[in-house]
Amino acid sequence: SLNAEEMIKKEEHLTASLEERIRAAAAARDNGSPVGFHIHPMIWHKGWEEGYAHVVSLIEKNFSPSDICMISFGTLTFTKAVLQHLRTHRTPSRVLEIPLEEAAGKYSYSLDIKKEMFSKVYSFFSEEFKKEVFFYLCMEDPSLWKPCLGREYSSDSEFEADMKNAYFRKIRDFVS
């Protein structure tokens, strides 16, 4: 799981830094394992574009597309109970500063904000990465796929089959 360094420092307390996460993934790759990255939970904040552009630059600097099975994007989503807990306990967090909308009993960003974030971060990747790495949206509204990643699926099973095929192809190439 990767995030912008500022979000790791301010929101993901007691976790590895971005650099440590990249080094750990590189060590796994060096030991013969393909890797995958979840850029998740993406958090809308001042300077988010620069923060996530840096994440992408570290991925591309330290890995080739052949090293990576998949990269997913996802945003912060809360249940009502978690959001109430944060507010009543006055947990210091930038998360409470963001505009959240209710959808399917949970709270998250609007589709417009998600579309902007996913499209922008995807655009930071080189064409080589876009062509050779399987990108997907993790548990996000299906209407976001086409405008953000340029493709869509007619069903969950179609997505799952495409993802499995991409994984197996990458793993086969990795061990060859």
PLM regions: where:
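Conserved AdoMet/S-adenosylmethionine-binding subsite of the radical SAM
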Residues: 1-104, 124
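Auxiliary Fe-S-binding modules of radical SAM enzymes
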Residues: 60-176
